[in-house]
């Protein structure tokens, strides 16, 4: 008898072949990187935490003289990253590590740059900063994209949704304060554009719905995943003026 896939297995199967597991773009990654001032001649050590299938990891490898440790909990995503890195001749710059982001085996002051796009929410913005700061050299940089309110008041539906999904959702000014209170000096910030959400994330997702449902024989769990994603897309289209991903770039000063 064929074993039924769990919800998390279905979610991985739905997202593993996508270029991205969240909003973003090559241009967003490079824009965030432009706020740093690394010596191009010095080989850097970089950690990309919660990397997924690694679209941004590839961008970093193509634009930095660096050894990049790409961390994710799910081997299916890391396998995709390894294949892409090899196809692009970047396999010598990227090391993949299957590990939880709250249990990392890194040394104190090991990295020049810690990167995480759309993933720090898993352990929370403040907790993530406090944990990961130890792995960063003084003068090193942290770059994070994080769900952020873009106004000080919101319609009840989207306010209630995000406070339930992620209680640490807040405005950029509050996130900057958290960075400053934890030994960082913010050097750059911007919101992700609508195309980073729609063109690069939601539209490709919509294109996969039918194939995913057919593959999994329209089971209740598979349909539930698609329905939840459709509702997320609806909320973004309806309330995009009130929230986005903010990209925060900060330098460790103490």
Which residues does each predicted region cover?
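Conserved alpha-helix/loop element of class I SAM-dependent methyltransferases that forms part
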Residues: 23-42
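Class I SAM-dependent methyltransferase SAM/SAH-binding core
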Residues: 47, 53-103
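A short acidic, Gly/Pro-enriched loop at the edge of an enzyme's catalytic core
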Residues: 102-113
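A short SAM/SAH-binding and catalytic strip from SAM-dependent methyltransferases
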Residues: 113-126
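A short glycine-rich, Lys/Arg-flanked "PGG" loop and its adjoining helix->strand segment in the class I
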Residues: 127-141
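Short, glycine-/aromatic-enriched active-site segment of Class I SAM-dependent methyltransferases
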Residues: 147-166
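Short alpha-helix
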Residues: 168-183
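Conserved Class I S-adenosyl-L-methionine
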Residues: 190-254
């Amino acid at each position: 008898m064929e074993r039924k896939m769990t919800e998390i297995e279905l979610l991985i199967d739905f997202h593993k072949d996508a270029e991205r597991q969240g909003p973003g773009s090559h241009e967003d990654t490079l824009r965030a990187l432009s706020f740093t001032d690394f010596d191009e001649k010095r080989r850097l050590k970089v950690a990309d935490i919660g990397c997924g299938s690694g679209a941004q990891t590839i961008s970093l490898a193509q634009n930095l003289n660096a050894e990049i440790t790409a961390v994710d909990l799910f081997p299916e995503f890391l396998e995709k990253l390894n294949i892409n890195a090899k196809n692009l001749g970047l396999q010598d710059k990227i090391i993949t590590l299957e590990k939880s982001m709250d249990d990392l085996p890194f040394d104190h002051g090991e990295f020049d740059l810690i990167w995480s796009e759309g993933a720090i929410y898993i352990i929370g913005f403040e907790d993530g900063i406090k944990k990961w700061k130890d792995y960063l050299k003084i003068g090193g940089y942290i770059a994070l994209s994080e769900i952020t309110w873009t106004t000080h008041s919101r319609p009840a539906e989207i306010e209630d949704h995000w406070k339930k999904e992620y209680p640490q959702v807040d405005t950029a000014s509050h996130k900057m304060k958290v960075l400053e209170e934890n030994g960082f000096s913010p050097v750059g910030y911007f919101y992700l554009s609508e195309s980073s959400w729609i063109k690069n994330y939601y539209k490709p997702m919509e294109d996969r719905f039918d194939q995913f449902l057919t593959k999994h024989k329209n089971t209740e769990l598979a349909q539930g995943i698609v329905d939840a994603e459709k509702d997320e897309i609806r909320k973004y289209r309806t309330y995009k003026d009130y929230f986005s991903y903010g990209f925060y770039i900060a330098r460790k000063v103490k």
